[in-house]
Structures are given as C-alpha cells and as structure tokens.
Design a protein with these regions (language model features):
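Helix-loop-strand module that forms the ligand-binding subsite of alpha/beta enzymes
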Residues: 58-134
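N-terminal beta1-alpha1-beta2 submodule of the flavodoxin-like/Rossmannoid cofactor-binding fold
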Residues: 1-83, 89-93, 156-181
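FMN-binding flavodoxin-like domain, especially the glycine-rich phosphate-binding loop
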Residues: 36, 104-181
C-alpha cells in the first residue's frame, strides 16, 4: 500500500523540506507500506478556476498539471500532510491543491505533521474540518514541531518525536489496511 507524504509548502527556504528529510530518515522501512514523498512545489497548479466542481468531474481535468496531480494523489491509499501554519490557518498553496481535486481524496485516511510557533495546531484542526468534507478518516495522532523549541538554529526535533512518528504511522497504516479491506 502507498502512503503519500505531501510536502505542503512551496515557499523559498521552507522548513517543510527539513521536516520531510527527518520523516524520511525516521519512517524507515515499514512492512507492506511504501511512503512516497510528493512535493507540492513540483506541480505548477493554477488557482482553482474550474468550470465545474472537481467532485463531479470524474477525474477528467482541463489542465495537464492538475491531471498529473490527480494521478499522484489517486495512486495513494492514505496521506500525511506536512503543513505549516500561516495566520492561524492552512497554507494557501496546499488548500488550493486539495480543492483542485475531489474523488481522489474520498474515504482515505490522513495524518498531519505540522510545524510553526505552536506546532501548527490550529492549521491541523482546520485541516481536519476540510478532510471531513471528503469523508477522509483522520488519525488523531499528530506531530507538531514547535518553532521556539525545535526550529531554532536549524531543525532539531526533540528525541521523543521519533516514537510519536512511529505511533502515527502505525495508526495510519491500520486505518489504510481496514479501509482497503
């Protein structure tokens, strides 16, 4: 089964790349699961301006980049969003990327790894509301890297974060397995 780890920031100098690197090192080999890192910055997605609702478009999109994004997301059985928190909410580029699609998200499990001044807790709670619209199954385990403690002078997660990540992956894989049947 495939878990898509979405690198959800496109800013220059983004912390998301450092978080993704740490996740790659700490997820390791997981029996029966492949973790694919999907970098939002690798897609030239337009602002959503479709003539129809993505949920009703049967995965047939007018834009080649949206189609490529759709295929990358559709191939996944579950997701981890690496998300910053901007102004107490979700990053616009990732929200736009989510809104551009529809059925590709439906019914799949999702977990969150946030970072920011408070560990992106407000962004993650906002993402949970958004995910519920797609009938996604959100994993309550989450990681929230706190800027003042873990991102001063580089990216230095506290030692217990690896254990938290393992618990998050265990639960996400459990959900993915049950949902896939």
């Amino acid at each position: 089964m495939k878990i898509g780890v979405i690198i959800g920031s496109i800013r220059n100098g983004r912390t998301a790349e450092k978080v993704a690197g740490w996740l790659k090192e700490n997820i390791g080999e997981r029996e029966g699961f492949e973790y694919e890192f999907i970098d939002l910055a690798d897609f030239e997605l337009p602002l959503y301006d479709g003539a129809g609702l993505p949920m009703l478009m049967n995965k047939q999109y007018d834009n080649d980049e949206v189609t490529r994004w759709s295929q990358a997301i559709d191939a996944c059985d579950g997701f981890i969003f690496i998300t910053p928190e901007y102004n107490h909410s979700v990053p616009a580029a990732l929200k736009n990327a989510v809104d551009t699609l529809g059925p590709e998200w439906v019914g799949k499990p999702i977990a969150f790894v946030g970072y920011g001044s408070l560990g992106a807790i407000r962004a993650v709670e906002h993402w949970r509301q958004i995910a519920s619209n797609f009938h996604m199954h959100d994993v309550r385990e989450q990681l929230g890297f706190i800027q003042a403690m873990e991102m001063r002078d580089g990216f230095n997660p506290m030692p217990h974060r690896a254990t938290e990540l393992a618990a998050l992956c265990d639960r996400l894989e459990e959900y993915a397995g049950k949902l896939r049947g």
